[in-house]
Amino acid sequence: MSMLKGAANGLASAISFGLIPLFTLPVLSGGMSMDSLICYRFSLAALFVAILMLIKKESFRITKSDVPLLILVAIFYDISSLFLLWAYDFLGSGLATILHFTYPILTTLIMMAFFKEKASWPKIVAILMAVAGVAVLSIQKGGNVSLAGVAIAVLSGLGYASYMVSINVSSRIKNLKGLKLTFYVFLIGDLFLIANSYITGTGIQPINGTSDIVNLLLLVIVCTIISNQTLIVSIKNIGSVRASVLGAMEPVTAVVVGLLVFGESLTVKSAIGMLIILAAVVIIILSGNRKGEI
């Protein structure tokens, strides 16, 4: 029963993450800037998480030494979120999400380069496959795929990989309760985005009508609150490895949304590149299961 519960929650988490384009693209097409959209997303998410913390009677207290680390983590999360939305402009939501999903590969590369994680043949094969997959997507006949878009999408994955590594290698951050960490990442990230919007002179744009309100609320509830909570349930029931493998449904969902809702095209070559990257990600996740983690 716990296996079924974990698998169901893992799929729900991945699919809800993959629905991000469904709620963000209509708001962006209505004229809202990326900074403003993410500001609203983070503000509402921080509010919802704060309410959950109050209901659970969890403390908001952090120490002074936590602040610099939380700022670093929030900056990485900001970079990841902004660059992913930026990549949508160049590649479409499906392809951009697939390239963003290289983050497990990039996480492994960071750990090997800076934290002396041992290389293994499965990891090396997965990294080479990921590079090959990105190359297949980048080198399209007739120049149908933007190289700038590919770079931006991969940088969004690098931002998320850096976010994950900074949490894992810092014992202080790692020991913060999940809701508290989530709250401060959203809050600090939001403050940086607000400051940046006024420094650049764009400011925070107003919400344009009921449809934007609905999309922003669904973005927060479905793609932030539900996705994170179901992921936690999944990990507790089936372990992080299996939950991570189920996470491959995230880019698949984004591709389906792009095709069915936004009319994005998918060539055979693009599909092959996507499958190579997904296979590489599954290999890199399973290669961490050296001690039988389930």
Language-model-detected regions and their locations in the chain:
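Hydrophobic transmembrane alpha-helices of multi-pass small-molecule transport proteins
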Residues: 49, 71, 110, 119-139, ...
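Membrane-interface helix-cap regions at the ends of transmembrane helices
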Residues: 45-63, 131-145, 188-212, 256-260, ...
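Juxtamembrane helix-entry segments on the extracytoplasmic side of multipass membrane proteins
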Residues: 2-7, 31-39, 62-68, 139-159, ...
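Specific alpha-helical transmembrane segments that line the substrate/conduction pathway
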Residues: 36-38, 42-44, 76-77, 85-118, ...
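Helix-helix packing/entry segments at the starts of transmembrane helices
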Residues: 8, 14-15, 40, 96-102, ...
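Glycine-/small-residue-enriched transmembrane alpha-helix faces in small-molecule transporters
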Residues: 1-36, 40, 75, 79, ...
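Specific transmembrane alpha-helical segments of multi-pass solute transporters/efflux pumps
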Residues: 16, 21, 52-96, 100, ...
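Transmembrane alpha-helices of multi-pass small-molecule transport proteins
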Residues: 29-79, 106-107, 159-166, 182-201, ...
